[in-house]
């Protein structure tokens, strides 16, 4: 019986990539910089796995004898968004980045969208989601015009107050936008951003929904599903892969619920993969430049790790990584172009060591494909032989 849990800590990077300067991300290091600002991180369980052996993190001692294999992965695809990162983890490397709109969307797109939904829109610029509802929320409530905005990522976001545009209607607008945004304007994600509250006290509700492009070729998820493995998505995995390759999904409103869903998914798993995204690190703390919140979220996850590890039998795998960085200590409120940590744990490891710096996130997808013994056409280089060395102790 082959089983694996793959957990993506959304936005939890571990140092700038060599090309970070192209993205204005020099100096970004989500984990290390957060630790410096808060006076050190207390993450004993990830510490035991070798987190500080990847790069020394204030507050987390290096382990002489870590319980996991450890390393870091570089992103080969251009970009630094969740879709690009998750697709690359699952074995797809993008040759060109998804389109971005630093000056807002072209007039022809906005006019076509307005015609299709029968309403004017407001905004049409890059913005922080919390800031733009502060700025335009009251006007939106008076007019009923949805707020369209983007970010440094390839996203077309639509914000609407739940009392003005019901959530189901907002989702319908997103489906219209998704159908329109193809070809040269094929953004990675259209995102519904419902909010509530009153002027001066607006807040985003948990009913966000992503409408992603489907992957352009089969991913690890598809190959596993085709071979009758369970592929269970937890969190926004279903959204990021447009539902492709999954046998079932669990959604959640926060990391606490997401961690609980790992246990629910495990009860359902016969043989196969649980693919988890925990988004609070990114959504609540990275984008809002809140290193204290990031610290609390990391501690909550770390506290849950022993129970997650306790699920595993001898040759099961638990893998912890990220999809990009989102350094809460920099002036930017956007994602950062960073290496991501790689921690690989199995209860039966007799020896552990460094996996080094992987050239692409796809090494992880390729490794899991080989672990599950499925023929595939994925990018990347498998390191299953290293995992097997850990089991053999050789």
Swiss-Prot record:
Enzymatic reactions: 2-deoxy-alpha-D-ribose 1-phosphate = 2-deoxy-D-ribose 5-phosphate; alpha-D-ribose 1-phosphate = D-ribose 5-phosphate
Binding site for Mn(2+) 2: 282, 287, 335
Signal sequence extent: none
CDD domains in the cross-refs: PPM
Function according to Swiss-Prot or TrEMBL: Isomerase that catalyzes the conversion of deoxy-ribose 1-phosphate (dRib-1-P) and ribose 1-phosphate (Rib-1-P) to deoxy-ribose 5-phosphate (dRib-5-P) and ribose 5-phosphate (Rib-5-P), respectively.
Family per record: Belongs to the phosphopentomutase family.
Name of the protein described by the UniProt record: Phosphopentomutase
Species this chain originates from: Dictyoglomus turgidum (strain DSM 6724 / Z-1310)
């Amino acid at each position: 019986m082959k089983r694996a849990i793959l957990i993506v800590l959304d936005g939890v990077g571990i140092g700038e990539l060599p090309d970070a300067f192209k993205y204005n991300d020099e100096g970004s290091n989500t984990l290390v910089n957060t630790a410096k600002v808060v006076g050190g991180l207390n993450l004993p369980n990830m510490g035991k796995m070798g987190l500080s052996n990847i790069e020394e993190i204030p507050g987390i001692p290096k382990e002489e004898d870590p319980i996991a294999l450890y390393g870091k992965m570089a992103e080969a695809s251009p970009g630094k968004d969740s879709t690009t990162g998750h697709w690359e983890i699952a074995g797809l490397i993008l040759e060109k980045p998804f389109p971005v709109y630093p000056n807002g969307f072209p007039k022809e797109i906005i006019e076509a969208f307005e015609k299709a939904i029968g309403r004017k829109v407001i905004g049409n610029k890059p913005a922080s989601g919390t800031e733009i509802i502060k700025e335009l929320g009251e006007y939106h409530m008076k007019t009923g015009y949805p707020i369209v905005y983007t970010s440094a990522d390839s996203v077309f976001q639509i914000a609407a107050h739940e009392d003005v545009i019901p959530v189901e209607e907002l989702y319908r607008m997103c489906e219209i936008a998704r159908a329109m945004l193809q070809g040269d304007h094929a953004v990675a994600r259209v995102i519904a951003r419902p909010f509530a509250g009153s002027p001066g006290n607006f807040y985003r509700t948990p009913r966000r929904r992503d409408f992603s492009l489907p992957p352009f070729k089969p991913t690890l998820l598809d190959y596993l599903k085709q071979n009758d493995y369970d592929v269970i998505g937890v969190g926004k995995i279903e959204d990021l892969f447009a539902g492709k390759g999954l046998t079932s999904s669990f959604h959640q409103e926060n990391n606490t619920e997401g961690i609980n869903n790992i246990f629910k998914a495990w009860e359902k798993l016969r043989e196969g993969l649980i693919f988890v995204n925990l988004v609070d690190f990114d959504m609540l703390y990275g984008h809002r430049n809140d290193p204290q919140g990031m610290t609390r979220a990391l501690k909550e996850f770390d506290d849950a790790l022993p129970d997650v590890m306790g699920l595993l039998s001898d040759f099961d795998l638990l893998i912890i990584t990220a999809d990009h960085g989102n350094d809460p200590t920099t002036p930017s409120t956007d994602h950062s172009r960073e290496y991501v940590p790689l921690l690989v744990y199995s209860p039966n490891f007799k020896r552990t060591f460094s996996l080094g710096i992987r050239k692409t996130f796809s090494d992880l997808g390729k490794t899991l494909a080989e672990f599950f013994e499925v023929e595939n056409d994925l990018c990347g280089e498998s390191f299953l032989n290293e995992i097997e060395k850990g089991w053999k102790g050789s």
